[in-house]
């Protein structure tokens, strides 16, 4: 790129430079020259530290590889392994007990347990939908998913099916019986609602009336006391809105005139710059930053076509109600509280390069760029200091003046400390008070898991979130022990002892370090986007395990998962778990090696085909369409939400089997060619899809998928980004894609 803007020792892409100066900086009172001078200084000071941390990863991995290669035949003793990891500094001393001191954190994080959406920032429509998913229709979520069965003529067709609707109403009434029970009887029996002397009164079939079992659950309403149009209830810190309109199509079929039950749903949302996006150059990054800016300024809008009509989707306003006394006004947030997930420490991006005597030098670490620019933009979502009004508009993000950044893929406490140093330097450049920028720690790398308490201590005054990520964590488990021997099959990983120990330890150490009431303790994604009945049955296990939040793939899933937090008082669970350590270091260090290679040839082929199909189905959309998060049908046509984490585990498992002779390179190539035809068929209805099977040698996507497996053992920590970014850039250049 020859037309870059020179800023000190940096050369900046003009599309980024213009965006920052003309769109992001106005309204922040930050002088452009001062800002860019600060960027230059941070890059100069912190890039060498970033590089040193990556070099340490490689050095530790080389030592571990060498140790395992010397023992791959005879095996090893657990104590010897532990001692070795301690000697090389992989295992660090656990710090003495402490409690985090994070302050200025919004209630959505500290005192509210509920679902968390993760959404790709490159898609403005998805981002708007997610931000607006703070409230969701339970009726719609039930009617449109398999939570309500099709039995007895209750199929969901092109027009409203009253039989299905009646099932939805009955389900919602049962939910209300559990979340906000009446003093006697059931919500199924009511024929109306009214407000009497500041309390809810439900009229019953027999003409009598009944109050709530706990009158304090009534917190607001719309309309008149004798004919409310909405009744607002609260349970376990979450709100339930009962909408009443006997003249509406649904309300007219309901003896109480209830037309919907609306649940407070996605309490928080992560706007993702990382695993769910394909951002490989300055143009991609600026699109992402611009969407983040629109969310923080409150002016992001997107034209949406639905049902033959086009409308503009914008961010929802806050919701107001009359308090039970009929006089006071109650205001509740209308939008999800937003985190932003930056990229990790590994990748660089050509949006900014070092000036090499007037030529383009090395690309600047992308994580440093993200920290600077997403934090700058985050200022637009903060309340002005000492002022009840907002600085740039009515749609706040944080009401306490914090910017929330999730930092992924950190390996150990030194990398967490580096992130905190970076955030501190960014605060200085932006003129923000220290610790304005909070950090969410993804516990998804093995060295972080094994040193989790030290990682939290390194961010004790910033941490607002720890979260397990089974897929990335398994990918790192495989890669770290790549030389130890062949691993078990992918599907068996979830039932291993180390996974259970990993999930338990995250909660236990979070509680031990004082996160309850100060920070989220989170758990992972439900990936089967169409199997909502299974999700409703199974995902309740996460709040029961002490997680104050867990990831969901859609607004609909957020509304359904919200029911679990009415059924489980997570903070009570945390009180019961406090003071326990349910896992041991030995369990966490148990490598998921196959104890004997007793797989039949058809089992091996099934595993290879499954993973090859998954890899191809995701990679082809990443490379050819620039889509980083896809609902990809698996080999059995079950739709799965795929991102780079799923790609990492699939490619690393096959790389491991290839390394140890379970499969051959020819097995991989043959399966990829066979599965390419399957993926082509699954995408046949997409007019923009480029088939792979007919000419795999000239399909960049196919070649990327093959490279991810065949060269998987050599990838840093098993990450897929280096190959994906290079291949996506290759595709964009070959296809003249901007």
From Swiss-Prot:
Belongs to the malate synthase family. GlcB subfamily. The modification Cysteine sulfenic acid (-SOH) is found at residue 629. GO terms for molecular function: magnesium ion binding; malate synthase activity. The lineage of its organism: Bacteria, Bacillati, Actinomycetota, Actinomycetes, Mycobacteriales. The gene is glcB. It comes from Mycolicibacterium gilvum (strain PYR-GCK) (Mycobacterium gilvum (strain PYR-GCK)). Its EC number is 2.3.3.9. Involved in the glycolate utilization. Catalyzes the condensation and subsequent hydrolysis of acetyl-coenzyme A (acetyl-CoA) and glyoxylate to form malate and CoA. Gene3D superfamilies: Malate synthase, domain 3, Malate synthase, domain III. This is Malate synthase G. Keywords: Cytoplasm, Glyoxylate bypass, Magnesium, Metal-binding, Oxidation, Transferase, Tricarboxylic acid cycle.
